């Protein structure tokens, strides 16, 4: 597992590697986090990095009693594969 960092000023969870930065970008909306964009550099795709940053985002939301709006299609698909996250989901 890579070292996922949280930059609250930039509103992102990310993994920094020599090949680039894998990230989950969000917007804070009161007591909700809108997970609206994930990105992994092409040469790093298929290694589970997007899932790692999304998992870190859900753990942060859970620990801080926040809800998640899964606007990013990738995040929405991951919720289907991780039913334990469904309790954190709200829709705008």
What are these regions, as identified by a protein language model?
Residues 20, 29-31, 40, 74-75, ...:
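A generic "binding-loop/recognition-motif" signal
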Residues 38-45:
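A short, internal acetyl-CoA/4′-phosphopantetheine-binding micro-motif in the GNAT/acyltransferase core
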Residues 60-92:
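C-terminal structural segments of small proteins and small subunits
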């Amino acid at each position: 597992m890579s070292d996922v960092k949280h930059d609250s000023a930039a509103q992102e969870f990310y993994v920094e590697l020599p090949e680039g930065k894998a990230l989950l970008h969000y917007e804070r909306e009161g007591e909700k986090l809108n997970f609206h964009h994930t990105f992994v550099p092409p040469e790093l795709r298929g290694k589970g990095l997007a899932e790692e940053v999304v998992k870190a985002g859900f753990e942060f939301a859970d620990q801080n009693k926040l809800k998640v709006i899964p606007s990013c299609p990738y995040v929405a698909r991951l919720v289907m594969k991780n039913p334990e996250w469904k309790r954190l989901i709200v829709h705008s």
